[in-house]
């Protein structure tokens, strides 16, 4: 009996213990540094960007130069400043989106896993259904119906991303609940809330953190795609996706569209590096299965 | 496992049925790999499906569809290449107008043949006009005020209007009024009866076949392209120069790249800046001109009571820097001096246009008694991004005067109903001519189409309305021109309408092509285009 | 059963979505003057059944659906079924090509990464695969178009064929197959040239995904005793990898491949818009922005059915590759 308890706890502790190892990987460090720099940029954009991102200068379509590090766009706005300010839109929104999706998905998945029965059935059928409809179609329909705008785009993406999280959380809760040491705890008469906080939560928390890192990257991608299609950010907002969309109209001035794209790549890559390293430290399978779509 | 397989088979067969049924309906493209004659490619960043527009009586008066309707269908009158001021004969060899400009009699040519060889007569004209009226779809307004459309004999067609309408010869040039082969269409579900809106079933037929007498016929159509073939039996003196014309739906950004590698190709959707970037390319001819479409702003009294305050509107009027708007609107762009575009009868000159005067704007704002006004600037996000640029400029202009404008650009599906439902505040919108005549611009007057969208209702400005009525009914062009100029001068002083610019428009073609000339009515005369 | 549930769900959702919009599709879709003409608006609403109460509209829609009738698109004014039949082959050709590319590349790279675990090769492949998963497809498509078409002229531009090349006789709607069937080799070459760039752009994300998952699945198998046994027996490394490791690792890889069809659909919306590819990605984007309800529901239903089908095939393949499941 005691052997079982040790075994189960072992897996968790090994995982946590592996994290410092993950930090030693160069790519993890790159990811961490990149992500941290973008967070700093998002916080400090008003002070570090050389110009007002909306200010229209007389010099249109200027190639990158000392005066304008990344050139100017079709209205004479400084692309560098706009890219920096873009972080202030994408990062907080992606975080808001991920926390909303985790609150909804985590609660529903947790309930489904813990209670089982018809609750489980309803939640999982709902999740299946959202899974079957492609993300962007659903998001486009929602945004088209509610009207474009970043907030509506966030709602739309939350609507399509909770099921992935619900599945993982449900799976983790189930596995933990079925494990011997929770059963033992019950036999020994420990109350339900104790089982939840002491046994279930710690086992669920790790993978969920990994998933969150990966989801932030995905959220940024999807939000920028909606903005690119004209369904997210609205001009003149300096949002990366809509900046790329403007750039597409002006191929000759390649810098208008290329740099916002580089910004998206770098921040999503940062979160993916982080998430990937953390995932190696935890049980990869559960996350893999849930994140397929 | 057993259950799974059964379910799978069930689903597979379901999908199979669905697709099988669907495939039965779809036209299979024909294969003739060896192009007998030359092919012309025209690219347009088209807003929607070509397939919707293949019935001229429904899909006509669509700027993007007009070039191929014009190539497939012949209308009663037409214009000489490059002209839009004097209607000349086409299917009608001549016409006469009564002195009161209410009755128009068209003599129909006897030698016009449809593409299937049938001879065209006045019955076909009567059918076409009645069908357009009774389908009551988009182009129906072309026949507003018409009380009678009759073939009095095989080669005479008479139109009667309830009010004097000297614009009728201009209206009948419209590609939506291209003459349809009535026998052929009736045999395939076409109807011109009064209940045609419900009984006409020719839409699908027109999706596969064209029924006109023009220099080209439609060979195939789908969402991405329309293929036109030369009409082998074309009755006119000038045979089409190309065996095939392909009208493709291509994004502007892609057009910019593709044209640099092409031959026999024309790009219609390049912005002024994009076109300007091609000027150095010796293989291309870039033609930039002033579009007859006007971009205007309006202050909606229905949503913003301050718009009823003429001083407030004037603060906006004199606060806008028109030249800064022209600067972002591409090569060929010009300020719109009034609502009537500079190309048409009755237009104001550039010297008469409103000029920016920040001091005057500020004093007008003070006179209005409104402190620190904030207004929402509503507009449609356009594919070229022009409206975004204009709105950003206007916002900056008005900030100089002390008016805060919050930009609210929306995609067309949201913005258009708001605009049409008079829900804009400070609106930014466009007007493309329905026909090249100042009568089309009556829409901007109180109680009319655009007027109502600005909450500017009948009785709001009696002097303007009276002048408008006289200008609309005047029969001779000299009088009309003068009255329309007076009308617009008044509009520029007292109306909530703020004409802004006529954008620059560019047509880029490979330089082996000739006669790539823009028309405000059908955009491009495909049949006239040739090669050196 | 799942299908019926899905159809009901998708249609209810689309109905609710498009009807919380305060705007009238008649006013949005009619021309400038016609939209202010009460008769034209009334005729439009009658034609599309918009004059009936919402529940009635829904029942009518379901009734038609039973006969395989998806209604008429408000945008194209054709049967949605006709529209889909026209656009699906284009998307199928693009999606299948990109999936094949992504599988071949992703699984190969994943196996290599696992065998070279934590060495330089593994790190490089990690950057490549995560890079593929981190690059916005719309941006990648534009950059690829700029570089490979505009600057280098290695590939032709947008569309499925050059303008002057006529499509092959309709058989499957997939131009590569149809042209070969008709013996039109020049058309085949042209269609492959047009296909290659959008398919690669579309494959980038899934390639990364498959590399990551193959790597972890293979790593897990490599730790097993029978792999060590096989190696100890002196079997060639390739035989070990393909006969033992890859087979044992395939269930999780298959799962991911099945789920990844969702990514492909998202990608096609963006890629088709940029490459003027006349498929359902472009169609659905235009339908959604025009609030064309019948078209939106039609596309959603179709894609959902494909998704379910693909994942059922994956379930069946499970049985083929995994002896334990076959026994059960």
Features from the language model and the residues they span:
Chain B
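Long beta-strand-rich cores associated with HINT superfamily self-processing modules
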Residues: 507-532
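Gly/Pro-rich hinge or "lid" segments in bacterial periplasmic/extracellular proteins
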Residues: 63, 176-237
